[in-house]
């Protein structure tokens, strides 16, 4: 009996070790240097080149699983956009702490710049950090919103950006596993679009994007964080198309 238990234990350990090895190898394959942004792929498009874009977000915007490289660097190097990356992993939209989205957007250096577009990540961290969801208000003034709630923070960012930065706003959602909290945020994001005339890039709800990751384990390091390959082939093309659409309207 002891031999049987020992053999089973060895088998289980072997399977686990194999799974971990495959997982690590998939990430390495997805982060090969050949997938990095490369200026040789630059093809000038006047609607994108030299535009000033502010990115506000957390780990997906930062590139937490791809050595700090995300779609931001792809857009900068391969489309010649002037990008300002205000991204910190693990941070939430809501909160009075200095690293929350709602506090970082108020940095003085940002208010001194002229941006053609603000792109804000719909954070996947608010639910994990137990932030209250909140609700959409009737008011429009940014001082009316409760920034300690996620929806209040979203409304504040929209109002502040329109008033202070005078720029159009694009919120983007992120691919991730099923999460009722995040699903409810996406629902309310569309409600805010009706109220505030914002743009949405719904990667979370994009059927094509979600299908790709089912068949290629090297595109993502986990359920949410892309590798370089994932940024190159999933996020960046979606962003380029959406940004072109938005900026074409502004001309």
What name fits each language-model region?
Residues 1-56, 60-67, 77, 111-116, ...:
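N-terminal secretory targeting modules
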Residues 30-34, 93-98, 147:
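Short, flexible loop segments at the rims of nucleotide/cofactor-binding pockets, characterized by
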Residues 52-54, 60-141:
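Conserved SGNH/GDSL esterase-like catalytic core that processes O-acyl groups on lipids
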Residues 102-251:
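Alpha-helical cap/lid subdomain in secreted, periplasmic
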